[in-house]
Amino acid sequence: MQVHDVMSTSIVTARKTDSVRSIVIKMMNRNCGAIPVVDGDARLIGMVTLRDVLLPLYPNYGEYIHDNVHSRDFVEMEEGYPEALGRKVEEIMSQNPLTVAPNAPVLEAASYMGLKNFRRIPVIDKGMLVGMLSIGDINRGLFFEKGMRG
């Protein structure tokens, strides 16, 4: 079974100039935790996850080491969320994301995803975004291909 057999082709995308707020709305409406960022030619330039949205609110590693984290006012930190939503996607997106080709074996893609602890990855063909592959897609494909027989 190959990636193109199970990938999703109905893809919600973002542009690097989009607001983080608009991306979070897309994620909530589609019940997904990651959206690919594309340029004007539909070429993948990054990924944004819900975790990326929250990262600017967290204390950084140096603050954890040098400060007493328990003395932080996490309620006050939470007040920074609206400001984080006003940022541009390009400020928080991950560049050069892990990708997979449509003709790759499904379990090869699953192993890469497992190693990186990713729930979904973009599918790229000739530099163009053609789909997204999720753990759910893989499980559905394997179940209907192999599980229905047993």
Residue ranges and their predicted role:
Residues 54-69, 139-150:
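A short, polar/charged loop-to-alpha-helix boundary motif
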Residues 5, 40-43, 55-65, 135:
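Short charge-dense sequence patches
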Residues 5-6, 19, 52-53, 105, ...:
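Histidine- and aromatic-rich ligand-binding microenvironments
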Residues 46-49, 131-139:
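Short hydrophobic beta-strand motif reused across regulatory alpha/beta modules
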Residues 1-32, 37-40, 44-45, 68-112, ...:
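Bateman/CBS regulatory modules and CBS-like beta-alpha motifs in cytosolic regions of diverse proteins
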Residues 114-115, 134:
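Extended hydrophobic
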Residues 105, 117, 128, 138-139:
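Short acidic/polar capping segments at secondary-structure boundaries
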